[in-house]
Amino acid sequence: MIGERPRGIRAVLTSGALLLVALLWLGPYAWMTLTSLKTLPEIVAAPAYPLPQSVQLGAYREVLKAVPVLRYLANTIVMAVAIAALQIALALPAGYALAKLHFAGKRAAFTLVLACLLIPAQVTFVPIFTMLGAAGLVNTFGALILPFAVSAFGTFLVRQALLNVPDELIEAARMDGASELRIIYGLLAPMLRPTLASFFLFSFIFHYNDYFWPLVMTTDDRVRTLPLAIALLREQGTGVRWHVVMAGNVILSLPVLALFAAAQRQILRAVTARAI
């Protein structure tokens, strides 16, 4: 009993510290949401009050009127999902080759993958833009998706996960007549579901929030993305209407929150599997 009391106190302190960190992370999002429900005079008033005097949804109506939000949102989701799906589809065979196959230059190939992680995207911007322009892909979804179809990080992640898979399992599948592609997508992919779900979420959020590349490659509303719409909200009028900007950011964040809520179980499985 004496030894259980310090352990219980430690658990309470740990939970309290984690709760404090969670509140610090949620604080900015809560402030953004509350600001979107205020009027502009309430926002600029001094001293500022965190809660609105009365809930106002006018900022959300202004967002929907000012920019084609639904079209931009659909474009953003299509782009982010397509990129994440392509990256997973290509990272699986690449990671499998680096983890389970034996060929000359395997170590050099893995070193090259690691080196690609160190290359800033800005370095490759000009040559990729030139190639896409020459191919006539500007203002198309191809220009937004194809440059990111291959992920060095995804390849590294899959390779590391496959190192924990017994070689005997793969040999047994080969003896049963399974092809390499059947082994990769039919046997190994379901086993790596937590890892792939974590990577899908990471890739989706990264490209969903991407501002620079869609800004450069698109000028047509048919393919523009939602982060560009948020920037347009800042530029309208003589001053920044912060309640409208915050409302746009709340709309922008909703699909990501929904995706995280749907995938959190797989993410926890991936984290616990790494811990074990």
Describe every region a protein language model picked out.
Residues 7-276:
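A structural signal for multi-pass alpha-helical bundles of membrane permease subunits
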Residues 1-3:
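N-terminal hydrophobic targeting signals that begin at the initiator methionine
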